[in-house]
Amino acid sequence: MKYIRNFSIIAHVNHGKSTLSDRFIQICGGLCDREMMSQVLDSMELERERGITIKSQSVTLNYRSRSNEQFYQLNLIDTPGHVDFSYEVSRALAACEGAVLVVDAAQGIEAQTVANYRIAMERDLKVIIALNKIDLLTADINRVSKEIEEIIGINSNDIILCSAKTGLGVLDILERIIIDIPVPQGNCDAPLQALIIDSWFNNYLGVISLICVKNGILHKGDTIQSMNTGQIYIVNQLGIFTPKQVQRMSLNCGEVGWLVYTSKNHRVMGAPVGDTLTLLINPAQKSLPNFKKIQPYVYAGLFPAGSTSQKVFADALYKLSLNDSSLHYESEYSEYLGLGFRCGFLGLLHMEIIQERLKREYAIDLIITTPGVMYEVLVVDDQIIYVDNPLKLLSITGIKEIREPIVLCNFLMPKKYLGEIIVLCVEKRGVQVSLVYKADQVMLTYELPMSEIILDFFDRMKSISNGYASLEYTFNRFQASDMVCIEILINGQRVNALAVIVHRITAEFQGRILVNKLKSLILRQQFDIVIQAVIGKRVICRDVIKQLRKNVTHKCYGGDVTRKKKLLHNQKIGKKRMKQVGKVNLPNSVFMSILNRDS
């Protein structure tokens, strides 16, 4: 065990984590030159297209130290950098004794850099700072080193200068990992304790779990059980990633590897992420600390746009939730959209990734309702009800107050963009908490309603700061607020899929946007279509799509005018009858257009 090192690479998005992983793999001979490509550990096509890491990936490398010529087993976990996937970082660090914090020498310290450093410190990990991209013409080593000293508090003499692209300084990082990162603390002779870090579904093998063996040894063919659920499994296969999936006969204490296991109850497909596995014979007395259960920030209804059955859709979501434990879902029914699921996400990017994965991996096209947040509702008997759906809010009677989620937002930006960012925060009903100048950067903290930052806040922040401002946020508390539910009525019929919860200040503006969108999308009928946005019984916005009208008098070329009047009168009676029995059918294309955030 003294020759094993477990570590993660953490950083803000696009600071070079995956490129550094590539260099480690190349130097340690994990792949030959013919097999090497950029972003080796980003196995999803979606990750390569977007240029970001979405899922944490593990690789076991053998490195021969320059100092003592000894071979070391390095278990590396590459992690995402986007704020929506910070839960992935937390899970990856649970299997490690240290971390390499990568900082872009041109961009400098950003919000998620600080957030990931705090996560590592909370777990009492040894952190090595690597200043990356020093080969860029825009790199400012002195400025960024000063930022690291003032914001993070690490001496600039301890910073390793490197370029993951060219390989400069990468060997120095590997040597520092061997020297600074502690040996895994465990006992090979103790009862087995293996922590499940991640799981995913394979069409041929079933559920595959990524595990870290904290104590004991796990062999192929062992009978194991979940310490949280008590479910019993048989180990079919196990091994390591090099990054190729290599089978082995056992995983020893301190190692990180993969595991294929099946239950006698075929309906049970795997133990949950964060669970502890132990042997059925000679089990461990207590489980390892579980991951903190994360609460979704953003909720939306997902409905299949095509002919996908509810069973197929539910099966796809279940398989995705194995791979992404932060995805929450429950059944939901809409009069217009049919059966679907109410899903919880960590942010809008997380929602987009799930939507794209359902489309690519399971061929399911979706209609997604307007994203919202979880509200806390206090009713007259002082009972608290949590609401993530506008329709659920409408069904509650005796409401005393509605409380919206407030998040603590930490901004990091150059000084010259401070004024415009403050204006944006004030516009979004923000309250300033602190303002600190560090080196050439400003650390600004605001309390903001979660509902105000889930839609266009990131885009506007990046636009006004030319991409230099960064944001990291965490849930703070629920706060009483004047929230209302806007409903859409079409000829008096409620369209529940378009209901939305907003602040009363913006209700009229939001209602007008919805009504105008619907007016531009709904085709004219042979009767008037009245579109209304209402709050309770009060109409806040109204518009009419005028009827198509047939020229019933075209055959009357002369004669008595009463003939024309009679035809027009009969048409009027027919239109009135048609309006009473006629129904406006909204096709899926209308919902897809009106619920598209980019439209």
UniProtKB/Swiss-Prot annotation:
GO MF, one annotated term: guanosine tetraphosphate binding
Family: Belongs to the TRAFAC class translation factor GTPase superfamily. Classic translation factor GTPase family. LepA subfamily.
Predominant subcellular localization, coarse grouping: membrane
HAMAP family per UniProt: LepA
Enzyme Commission code: 3.6.5.n1
Broad enzyme group: hydrolase
Name of this protein: Elongation factor 4
PANTHER family: TRANSLATION FACTOR GUF1 HOMOLOG, CHLOROPLASTIC (PTHR43512:SF4), TRANSLATION FACTOR GUF1-RELATED (PTHR43512)
Pfam families on file: EFG_C, GTP_EFTU, LepA_C
Binding site for GTP: N14, H15, G16, K17, S18, T19, N132, K133, I134, D135
Domain of life: Bacteria
Catalysed conversion reaction: GTP + H2O = GDP + phosphate + H(+)
Localization (cell): Cell inner membrane
GO terms under cellular component: plasma membrane
Keyword Aminoacyl-tRNA synthetase tagged: no
Keyword Membrane: yes
Function: Required for accurate and efficient protein synthesis under certain stress conditions. May act as a fidelity factor of the translation reaction, by catalyzing a one-codon backward translocation of tRNAs on improperly translocated ribosomes. Back-translocation proceeds from a post-translocation (POST) complex to a pre-translocation (PRE) complex, thus giving elongation factor G a second chance to translocate the tRNAs correctly. Binds to ribosomes in a GTP-dependent manner.
Keyword entries, A-Z: Cell inner membrane, Cell membrane, GTP-binding, Hydrolase, Membrane, Nucleotide-binding, Protein biosynthesis
InterPro entries given in the database record: EF-4, EFG_III/V, EFG_V-like, G_TR_CS, LepA_C_sf, LepA_CTD, LepA_IV, P-loop_NTPase
Residue ranges constituting the tr-type G domain according to the UniProt record: 2-185
